[in-house]
Amino acid sequence: MRRFITDKDLVFRWSVVAPGSVALGFLFAFLHVPAAWILAAIVVSGASALMTGKELPMNRHLFNFARGFIGVLAALPLLSTQLSQLSHFVLPSIAVTIVTLAIGIGGGLLLAHKEPEISQETGVLSMLAGGASIMPILAKDLGADYRYVTLSQYLRLLAVSVSLPLITHLFPHTPANNAVFATAQSQPWWALVIVVVIALVGHRVGKFLRLPAASILGPMLLVVIVGLLIPYEVSFAPPEPVRYFTFLSIGWICGGSLSLAALKAFAAQLPSTILFVVVLIAGCALTAWPLMSVLHVSYFEAYLATSPGALETVLALSSEGGAGSVVVATQVIRIVSVLALAGWIPALIKLLQRKKS
């Protein structure tokens, strides 16, 4: 009987949280709030968890399904970027990526050292630039505090998204007068079936191949393989409602596990978190100078290329400002590098600790 009441209570809470999240998501999207759907889900599910004093669990199979679509979405920039375009920028981009990763890892370790409540895995994942929607999933897989990682990542995303239009407006650039549109991709029904199958089995393939962060890299690998075998004109982008569901799922996992104790802990660590976010943004801005010199591009392009996240805002400003392919190439290389490294963070931390001792 108690089990029935508990399940009935959970169904009622979800019947309020799910439509409430969708409504707030549309409102945030209309207001152009960064990461609108994820933040909407965090707000609504977090309010439910805080008001009832109980976590709001999400069905494990449904969450695994959503994680598969995160991997699919992460792979799409690789399919839309030509290999020749990437190869020209690969070495400078890798150099910039190494510096960016070093800042993120160093900042995360310092944050963990300064705030004993934060583990080293949590600190590093909260400071890695790029893939804000992916980091909470990786944090959950790696046993880090995914609530803190999510809140920190979206604090960074918000700071970058708000500052980018204001800062890049100060840099000289040539606005694009004539928009160049790529050939429209078609999406037959069987392409959608392939995407759904990849989302369902991708994490199992990743585990079978023993990939780090298998729930993300497994679907990514399958999407890239399928994309190489099938003509470019076919789109593997999930439909908009599926994207909304995927982003909402990330927010529900974070917000549904919030508590007053967790929020108080995050608030207590907020000054340190903000400081390291500012250092990360400033460090990435500094790496734009050598990139500008080596590739002979404008600082406007280099700054967008090295921006620590907010990819959609970066690409919109890049298109509006007439930036070259260096922006897309560098951002894609950095995201792939971050994903490849993130799964090895526990082993990397153990290696650093061994050398230190």
Sequence positions of predicted segments:
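Membrane-interface helix termini and inter-helical loops of multi-pass transporters
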Residues: 80-89, 170-186, 231-240, 262-264, ...
